[in-house]
UniProtKB/Swiss-Prot annotation:
InterPro entries: Coact_PPARg, PIN-like_dom_sf. Keywords: Isopeptide bond, Methylation, Ubl conjugation. The lineage of its organism: Eukaryota, Metazoa, Chordata, Craniata, Vertebrata. Belongs to the constitutive coactivator of PPAR-gamma family. It comes from Homo sapiens (Human). This is Constitutive coactivator of PPAR-gamma-like protein 2. The gene is FAM120C.
Amino acid sequence: MGVQGFQEFLEKRCPGAVVPVDLLKLARTVSRQQQQQHLHRQLPPTAALAPGAPRAARGSVPLQPPLPPAALGAYSGGAGPTRHHHPAHHFHHHGQAQPGLHPPLPPPPPPQLPGARVLVDAGSALPRLYGGYQTDWVCGGQWNAMLGYLSALCQACAYPGGDGLELVVMFPGGLGKDRLAEWGRRCQAERQTAQLIVGHVGNKGTPPPRAWFLPPACLSHCVRLALIRFRVKVFQSLEDHHLEVVAFFRENGFHGLLAHDSEYALYNIPSYYSSHALKLSWNGKNLTTNQFLMQEVAKQLGLKRMNFPIFAALLGNHILPDEDLAAFHWSLLGPEHPLASLKVRAHQLVLPPCDVVIKAVSEYVSSIKDPSNLDVVGKDVFKQSQSRTEDKIERFKKAVEYYSVTTKLSSLPVGPSFLGFRNNRLGNPPLPRNQVGTISAGKPMFSHQVPQKVKYPPPFPVGPNSSLLFSSHALGESHAFSEDPMLQNSPFANWAVSYDSSASQFPNYLPSKASPPLGPDSSHSSSSDGDEPNGASSDHITEAFHHQPEWGNPNRDRGSWAQPVDTGVSEASLGDGEPHIPSLLSMSTRNHMDITIPPLPPVAPEVLRVAEHRHRRGLMYPYIYHVLTKGEIKIPVCIEDECNMELPPAALLFRSARQYVYGVLFSLAETQRKMERLAMRRRLPVEVPSVILKEWSAYKGKSPQTPELVSALTFREWTCPNLKKLWLGKAVEDKNRRMRAFLACMKSDTPSMLNPANVPTHLLLMCCVLRYMVQWPGGRILHRHELDTFLAQAVSTQLYEPDRLQELKIEKLDARGIQLAALFMSGVDTALFANDACGQPVPWEHCCPWIYFDGKLFQSKLIKAGRERVSLVELCDGQADLATKVEKMRQSILEGVNMNHPPPSALLPSPTFVPPMVPSLYPVSLYSRAMGSMPLPPQGRSRGFAGLHPIPPQGGKLEIAGMVVGQWAGSRSSRGRGSFGMQVVSVGGPGKGHGKEQTGRGSKGHKKGNKQGSSDGVSKSLELHQGRSRSQVNGNSGALIKEEKSDHRLPAPSQCALSRDSNECNNGNRYLPMNNREKNHLQEQKLETVAQRKED
């Protein structure tokens, strides 16, 4: 969009408007000025505090109470003493002086006020908050290095003399449906960048260029957790992120905004700093960046700052896209412009360069005689438009209104204020934290966008007492939401709900058509070059997938696409005899194809209050509030090779976990139980309505312009309690249910996962993610050495030495390792989502990735394990005790896992890539198998094409009418193992051409009970254990598990982790004892000897 290129234009073409500044020096200067102003404004204590005397004279400024204990003085590592100034103690001390008895006391020293407060937009400043654009981000993230950078940044801002810089960070927490087209274009660009990254690493083995920076998976939430650890105030937006950032900035008197988004420059922010140029010196004494002088920008462009809204509307934005303004932009250039020949090249829609458009539009806006008459301006802009002229003019007026809302109103209508910050003057501190009242939201500009007033409770304590919010505790003693001191003392009962619970039967149901805050017409923006067929031929897309009464019936069609309504052709063209074909510059553009979902089940008002409360304060995963209120989420893009069919996309890999989380959030299990009881009473069939949600994502074969419909799932093993009890329950059973719900969502509900002797407490979340990845039904994701690498780097002492890891040199990066790291961090992202949805059974201190993962360390150990084939002890830096921990964790991860599922067949659609808009239904422990009996995939990477499986390594024979006419041997690496049968292909006769398998020949064969023929049997030891799936460690092969021959019966379900009957691990899935292992080893040697003799 033209708006997004405005900041780059300022940096390159307006050198006088971009000046370097030192934020720490500015903070100290502002602090001294505030203290001097405080001394001049202060009244005599006797006049101010005499009984019955007024607080201040008319026209004077009342004394502002100082801040509570400083937020930036209690970091880990220490950055200065904590300052305590209590207002009540201050007044009481000076109230003791009585005139006439003693001479008046000297004036007290001025309180130490904060130097300056800067608001940081985390949505555009994530690369700098991560620590910069160093090349190690491609390995999956160096989280301890990021933690060290944020610690140094916070310590530098916390100046010990009271002249520090207070940082307040706001993360994007809104769904942003009105910017969906912009998000889709960004996803397509990130997909292309990911392919460039994978290709570069695969070909050269070196880190990609800095310009290809793609944020590591889960970066936003890792930064949020790190800032919470350092006691930095963190918030999340609720709807429109840009408007809420500007409203929060103006309401609380911040001295500057640190971001990298052109829209903030056009919002007329007083002090706008670039986060892209933010640099922290090595000694922590200088924090430099660039400041944009918008007054100088307006002078160089020949504009008045009051005309910035019209200028922003005509550049192209999310309301009025570039494609709708293409004809206007080309008309400004004129036919004699050197670039005019590009307008009709190959009959395609070509847009002028951004810098050329900015100059031309600025000249046009400066020549407007009456900028207030938007109707005249709109008609002049779209005078060459051949379709939808009125619609474009209306959206032009809405765009002007959108960008002028920040300059017209001092209190923006974007909802209530945050955490006790009130409207105050620039530079003044906020009100004390114990004086928080209701805040008026101002006059609404868009009525359907503005929520009602909400009375917020006192904010959480910041500083030494902030541990009350996230206290360190054991897993079994985790606090529920209701046990939070912030929530206990808050008047939740007096809250005014921001939604009308009596307006509908489903209070949290928001139709997708009304989601954009600027009305339904704002969604007619352009789309990117997606994978959708016929993507540029329709004008307006109406709502599709109308609500069906039998939505839950999988045999029925879930809806049909509505025919596009061509409302763009004018009435004059319809009246002509011949059809009118508009030009490409005036044709309407397609935004996205939304789908209407059935109404969501109702959610308890207490749950929604807690969800909104924690969402605004950055204490909860943002997906949760979106799911409860809108029933849809957006999934970011991560690094994945679209040409590699071995690894699934992250959006599909962790979809099953998200489906279970949806079931937990909407209390689907309790609903089903109530419906079953009601059906039994009335003797009617059970009809449980399905809960359908929308997931917006982009991966191979999936365009971001269309959502996927996903249904919520329930646990089969037990009935999860409702969300209110899961979040607000205080009993010990409720805590156990929270933990069990989290483990069930991650398919890790086994006893050994909660045994600290097997899985350390701080590594529980990591082991749950790895166990989930091991159980992927579409094929094997992790080999054994890769699983050991994840575990070995988690227990390594080098994990907490970022300086040493920074000096670590990796000769050639492993492309598969980069994708595995991205998948793992996407799993951590999903685990954080599940943990917050289940009531946070895992404390936030144990969720942070810097305690169990480092991408660069993982790469170095993966190269040792994969290429150099080192032993497990060498992989653990020569420490046998660490190798023992890795073995125990591996056993816990593989406990009860059935690895006998075959890879997807080439003749059948792969279960890995589900077609769009089809919900992926994967049960808990039962996965659908491909038709026929297929052997396990070969160990290691196959050299064949994806989907084509090599000849079975056990060999086989060809039978015609029951007679063996041909026979072939298998590979020497797997010949004679006896674990899998020989492949038999029968043509004619009883087999009817179907393939079958026969077991290999052992030392003592026996006849199999089969009428068609006989085959070699297995040994008695294998016969004794037939049908059991054992998780046995394979010594030197690359396979993750070596399984014995089974009769394909389902394994016995493993005992749950929190069973009342027993707290011990289930012995039914333990490893084989040593005598059985020795017997199996001898038997394998005998089988191999017999097979070699037979071949000779």
